[in-house]
Amino acid sequence: MPTLDRQDNVFVLDLGDGENRFHPDWIASVDAALDEVDKAGGPRALVTAATGKFYSNGLDLEWLSAHARQHEDYSASVQALFARVLSLPVITVTAVQGHAFGAGAMLSLAHDFRVMRADRGYWCLPEVDINRPFVPGMAALVQARLTPQAAHEAMLTGRRYGGTDAAAAGIVDRAVAEDAVRATAVEIARAQAGKAGGTLGTIKARMYSRVLAALRGATPQG
């Protein structure tokens, strides 16, 4: 399960050491950690990272299959998490050390900056290959955080991007060696910790007002 640590002005949220799928308990744990970051006050920034082969493998399809009647509530909770990260009044940096697929890839896009391992691991939106159309909020998030060309290719082809290719496409900001992923993310976050506060939160809310409205208000479909 996710754990939260603090290194001076930088909170580090480790999403876990498994596939880190979006199980309801996992979502609740991440949301509780974000509550702590939000309420902390003072200079601060957030890094999200993970341990092992996966950053996040996306939706918990096994749980969803067993709880089909909760489909809409589940989808709404996933979109609410994206909106929470996107609008958090601190600078957020994600350290993608392993595979980021589907909702895991979208979670990375909700952060302000992204660092990815250069030599192994893929960033991928496989929805087109698994017959799960993007709901409006998720589509809006991807299109707001990527260039039109990158969003078009990622969404329509399901391409698997390695770190170097992801950096070239603007999906991530930096691709670095395995042992530098988390440290680089912390370095970026620490340099921007002084920006935390209401002004930053207002800028984000206005910059992404349409995306946030779609994530919070769209009827979940998948």
Predicted regions and their residues:
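Glycine-rich beta-to-alpha transition loops that act as phosphate-gripper elements at the mouths
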Residues: 95-101, 154-159
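Short, well-ordered beta-strand core segments
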Residues: 92, 114-115, 175
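Catalytic-core regions built around general acid/base machinery
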Residues: 33-36, 77-89
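CoA-thioester-processing core
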Residues: 101-154
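Amphipathic alpha-helical segments at domain termini/boundaries
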Residues: 1-16, 154-194, 202-222
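Hydrophobic/aromatic residues within transmembrane alpha-helices
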Residues: 48, 107-108, 166, 185
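Glycine- (often His-adjacent) and acidic-residue-rich active-site loop
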Residues: 49-81
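Conserved CoA-thioester-binding segment of acyl-CoA-metabolizing enzymes
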Residues: 1-49
